Amino acid sequence: MVCSLILWILLRLTVVRRYHGGLEHTGIYVGSNQIIHWSENSKVETCNPEAFLQMGGDLALSIYVSCIGSSQVALRARAQVGHGIDERGPYDPLVNNSHRFVIECLSGQECKEDLLVKDPIEYCKVYLGADNWRVWDRGN
C-alpha cells in the first residue's frame, strides 16, 4: 500500500527534499523521474532522483515527497529551467538557495529575503495544503 501511495504521489507533481549532515536541499518533482531545482552552479536544472541525492558531493540517503502536489507549481518550475545568474542572481546558500526557488514556484511570486526565515515546508502547507511527507522508495 505504501508503494502505491508513493506512486500516486509521484504522478501528481510535488515538492521534494533531501537531508544530509543537517542540511536540506529542495526541488520540484515534475514527473517522468525528473526534479527541477536551483543548483549551487547558479542554474535552474533538471536532474533525476539519483543526481538530486548527490548534489554538493554528499550522498544523502532519502528523498522526501509531499503527499500533495500541483501541476501549476510544476509549470512554474519548468518555465525557469535554464535560468541562471542573469535571471536569478548568483546562488547563495543563505538567501538565494533551493528553498527560495521552491517558495517562488509554490507562491508564483518573487520571494523577498525576509520570507526566507521560514522553512519551505511551511509554504507547502499554505499553498498546497501539504502537511505530510513520505520517503520516496525509488526501488519500487
Enumerate the language-model features and the residues they cover:
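Intrinsically disordered, low-complexity sequence elements enriched in Ser/Thr/Gly/Pro
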Residues: 15-16, 74, 132, 136
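Activation targets extended, charge/polar-rich intrinsically disordered C-terminal tails
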Residues: 79-140
